[in-house]
């Protein structure tokens, strides 16, 4: 254990040093035409109160909630099948489909969704050929497209966490419910689902945090029409070279993420008692 302390301490120091540098930049004034920041100021944080930036924060939080919710809706059946399926081939297929995206970069996965959601992409081509639509649907550069692609990004970790929780549930609980007259659906709703709440909480909070920090997916799929905090930080830092304001936006985003995750954990704490002990 002591052998691992030094590397962990070095990593922690690296993260703290980077955070301190960003904090220091966020409290400095922007000097137009210069990459060097000016003196101490709180103007960067007061500027975040403007409706434009407040709207970006609200949109980002809403997209994070949507992504976490739909990732849970898609991931739970996959995790359940992965744990309880008796067919080895089916288990292997689910595992490969779920885990493979982890071996691909976010940019690669995002470009694959451009191929799927574009005006000449797979979805529109199938709908046009089937006669269901007469002209391509606008799926790119929309919130729907961004959330869809982000669900694909966060799905593997959701399935892994849910599968870990489901695998620790003793099947005797379900058998006991069945022996008392509960059908499969009622047994799932009254036994399996409550006992898997620790995995649900872990998966949802992780998906929320990953989505909040996502950059490539909203940048490429959103195309500048769906603004999130990470994209705005990029625009301010590398297009306007306003690094102090970009740093203040990063700090505010980090604080908001911790606040929302803290509220989610506090709201879900009463449910954790249903988990397996």
Regions flagged by a language model, labelled:
Residues 32-38, 215-242, 277:
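Glycine-rich helix-loop "coupling/hinge" segments at transmembrane-helix boundaries
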Residues 40-49:
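A short amphipathic helical element positioned immediately N-terminal to and/or at the very start
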Residues 1-33, 48-167, 191-215, 222, ...:
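Membrane-water interface segments at the C-terminal ends of transmembrane alpha-helices
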Residues 169-173, 272:
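Short glycine/proline-centered loop/turn elements that form peptide/ligand docking sites
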Residues 177:
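The alpha-helix within a helix-turn-helix
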């Amino acid at each position: 254990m002591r052998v691992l302390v030094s590397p962990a301490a070095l990593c922690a120091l690296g993260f703290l040093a980077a955070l301190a540098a960003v904090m220091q930049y966020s409290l400095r004034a922007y000097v137009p035409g210069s990459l060097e920041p000016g003196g101490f100021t709180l103007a960067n944080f007061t500027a975040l109160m403007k409706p434009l930036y407040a709207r970006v924060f609200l949109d980002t939080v809403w997209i994070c909630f949507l992504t976490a919710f739909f990732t849970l809706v898609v991931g739970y059946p996959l995790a359940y099948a992965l744990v309880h399926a008796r067919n080895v081939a089916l288990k292997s297929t689910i595992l490969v489909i779920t885990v493979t995206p982890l071996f691909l970069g976010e940019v690669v996965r995002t470009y694959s969704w451009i191929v799927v959601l574009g005006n000449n992409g797979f979805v529109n081509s199938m709908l046009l050929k089937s006669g269901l639509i007469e002209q391509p649907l606008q799926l790119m550069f929309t919130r729907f497209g961004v959330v869809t692609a982000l669900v694909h990004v966060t799905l593997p970790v959701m399935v892994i966490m849910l599968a870990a929780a489901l695998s620790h549930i003793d099947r005797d609980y379900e058998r006991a419910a069945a022996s008392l007259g509960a059908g499969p659906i009622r047994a799932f709703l009254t036994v399996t689902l409550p006992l898997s709440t620790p995995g649900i909480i872990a998966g949802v909070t992780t998906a929320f945090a990953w989505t909040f920090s996502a950059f490539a997916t909203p940048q490429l799929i959103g195309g500048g029409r769906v603004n999130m905090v990470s994209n705005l930080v990029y625009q301010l830092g590398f297009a306007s070279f306003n690094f102090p304001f970009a740093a203040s936006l990063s700090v505010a985003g980090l604080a908001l993420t911790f606040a929302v995750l803290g509220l989610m954990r506090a709201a879900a704490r009463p449910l954790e008692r249903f988990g397996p002990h």
